[in-house]
Amino acid sequence: MLVAGNWKMYKGPAETAEFCLGLREQELDGIDVVVCPSFVSLAVAVQLLAGTEIAVAAQNVHWEEEGAYTGEISAGMLSEIGVYGAIVGHSERRQYFGETDETVGKRVHAALEAGLFVIACVGETEEERDRGETEAVLRRQIAVLEPDDNLVLAYEPVWAIGTGKTATPQMARDAHDLIKSQLDVPVLYGGSVKPENAAELLAMSNVDGALVGGASLELESFTAICRAAIHS
C-alpha cells in the first residue's frame, strides 16, 4: 500500500522542513509513504527524511538527459540530489502545460530508464465521463506505457481533483479494473482523497494506495490518510 502526497505549488523550503520534521515523528510502518514537494524544496525534504522509510519524489521530469529546455529538470539531476521518483502526467500538467499522451510516455520512459520510481497519472474529464468516453480515454492514456517494477499508475478522475467530489466506490472499482486489465501494475486512487473517505476507498481490493493532493498539505490530515492505509 502506497500513499503519496502531491504538494503542487505549495510549501517552500521552510514549510517543507517543518512538515518533514513532523512527519519523521509519525509511526507509519506497514505502508510506503512518498512526499512530492516543489523543485526548490526537494533537497530539503531529501535531507530531512534521510534515514527514514519515507521517500521523496518530484512532480515532473523531462525526457532528455540535458539540453536547451528552459524550466525543465532531468531524471539524472533528480537522482543526483537523492530524489527517489517523480509524478508524471498529472492532469494539471496536461491541462495547463500542454502535456500529451506522447510527452507523458516519453517522460515516463526516461525516468524509468534512469532508475527513478514513477507515478503516472491517468483519468477522464467530467465532459468525457458524461459522453461515456471514460474507457476509451483510459485505454488511450495507458497505451503509451509499459509494465515496469518501478511504475505505478494513479487514477485521478479530473472532475474530482480539487472539487471536493469523489468517485463512488463503484466508479473507482470499475476504473481500476479497466486499468489493471490493460497494464499489470499497482494503481492508486487520486481524486479528492481525504481522511473522511480514505478508509472506504483504500479498503477496495483493487486500490493499491492513494495520490493525495490538498489533504497532504497538513500533517494531521496526511497522517490520518496514511493510518487508514495501514489499517485497510
Predicted regions, residues:
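Active-site loop-to-helix "anion-binding N-cap" substructures in soluble metabolic enzymes
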Residues: 1-232
